[in-house]
Amino acid sequence: TAPATDYTGYLVDVYRTKENGTEVILGTIAVDVSSDWTRFPRYGFVATFDASKKMDGVIEKEMAFLNRCHINGVQFQDWHNKHHWPLGGTREHLDEVYKDIANREVYTEVVKKYISTQHSLGMKSMFYNLCFGALDDAVSDGVKEEWYIFKNTGRMDKDSHDLPSSWKSNIFLLNPANTEWQAYIAQRNDDVYANLDFDGYQIDQLGNRGDRYDYDGNKVNLPKGYASFIEAMKQKHPDKRLVMNAVSSYGASQIAGTGKVDFLYNEVWGDEAGFKDLHTIIKANDQYGNHALKTVFAAYMNYDKAGSSTGEFNTPGVLLTDAVIFALGGSHLELGDHMLCREYFPSTALQMNDVLKTAMIRYYDFMTAYQNLLRDKDTEAEISVSLNCTDAARNLSLNAWPPQKSAITVYAKNVNGRQVIHLLNFLNADNLSWRDLNGTMPEPRLVSDVPLKMNVSGKVNKIWVASPDFHA
């Protein structure tokens, strides 16, 4: 029986007792006792729904790994028929199979099986869609010309997201603040919810578009429109969850300010490429969300390597980025039916090797078990940490946040009456970007038995030490 205290993480030891009374630990696993998954979101994804997923055991095996990593919410990417008509078929008659935007086959039974399998494991299922997308046949489905946004005031050049010619269509953009469009897409979502047991809507946008205009020639305020759109979606389906992407932080304050999203989601790019930028985003989001909303990063690892070749993820780069994100109190959208390397979620250019898969289990055990120290409300602390030794031959240096190359970075905060000190190893780092674009980040140099001196306030009752590289 789980303890009664809500929103608490635990690390459980599985052990046996020897004849002499000593305990032998056989393994450890994290447990999250929380009544609402959005308090500590650990977000995953699925992105392929073709015939290969109908084979016995495929979906179950994929979801078993996500479950072992304590993933508690799953985003369904590129599952939909059309951006303006997401359901494959009609409310009254579902298509057995339909084509997604890239003309890949999507089987309705596969979508349904993913949802039911996730629900059986205690996960929530979120469907993905833009807030303002329509394909080139939208007029035949009832989308009106007056709802679009344009690149100029002459109604001649619709804003669009252009795609390869082999795909279904380019995506043409509508005004997210247009109330008729809101009512239209909310009804299409109602068709989805009536047929598929999704728990909510993962809303997407496309970042700063520059100056754009509505049908009447008025300049469009997209961030304000996003807030209006979120409000309309929540009003139509008050019991469904909402999350919206803030691409490069665009519209983040307006999204959070609605009070209608369940956590904050930032897709980060080259303009926010530094480890220090992740800290800036989390602190800004904490203010935008009135200290109540957690942050999930869609942060694509080894991006350039994935764009030019196939192979494996660079394990040290992935783990260093996760270590920083977790220390800062965030989580990382990266695990799904494969590991994420590009904004096109179905891309499988890079794969996890067995070492990285094992490390992911340890890291997610760590994030889950220690979620209260990592992700509960905190205040940054000015705790002085220094080397209590004169061994110059070890070539060690410590610095306070933000990170520096050739140093161990200290990030300290006060959480729940405890002082938490993170030691992040950048001793061998070849750059200070979380992206590890070409997969070149070296494994950190291992240092051990280093005496540290810490100046802390108050009486020290106990000191605990934990690391996902050793303990979880």
Model-inferred region functions:
Residues T1-D36:
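Beta-strand-enriched, solvent-exposed domains that form extended recognition/catalytic surfaces
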Residues N175-L293:
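Active-site neighborhood of glycoside hydrolase catalytic domains
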